[in-house]
Amino acid sequence: IVKGLGLAATLAGGFAGGFVARGLDLRTSMWLAALLQMGSNLVFALQAVMPASYGMLAFVIVAENFTGAIGTVIFVAYLSALCQSPLHTATQYALLSALSAVGRTYISAPAGFVAAQTGWFWFFVLSCLTAIPSLILLWWLQSRGHFEALARPRGKLSAED
């Protein structure tokens, strides 16, 4: 199920993410991706309280892979918008993408402890709630005009640059 259906869901989510990125502005795309990924954790919580079934497992895998791929495409679009300096684009992108891995690297070890202490249902509810700071950050960036500033075209380098 994971390799067949999961791969298909990831590919479909990647295409859907591309359509979202092209069809919506970056601010709206970021909100959509954040809420979809937050919601996909609740699908895991639902699975934790349902009787074991291949249908539910398939649904959870499709939901996670589809929303994860959308989030990845939108995140890459956001990083690309941030990295607009013609002189340092590759360096900026490498540093930002490496920084994005910090959370999943350091949170994975204590996550097992939390799951053992709370059970799978509450673990996934808590993991959903951990997205709230990201939503607050998105709101803060939006209130400061961050996304509008990224959307403004930047000039090309001149001889003085």
Describe each model-derived feature in a short phrase.
Residues 1-10, 56, 91-95:
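Loop-to-transmembrane helix entry
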Residues 110-133:
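A membrane-interface helix-boundary motif in multi-pass transporters
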Residues 35-52, 139:
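C-terminal ends and interior cores of transmembrane alpha-helices
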Residues 12-31, 115-116:
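Helix-to-loop junctions at the C-terminal end of transmembrane segments
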Residues 126-158:
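Multi-pass alpha-helical transporter architecture, strongest
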Residues 69-85:
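Intracellular juxtamembrane helix-capping segments at the cytosolic ends
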Residues 86-116:
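A late C-terminal transmembrane helix in Major Facilitator Superfamily
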Residues 7-15, 105:
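Residue-level signature of mid-helix packing/kink "hotspots" within the transmembrane helices
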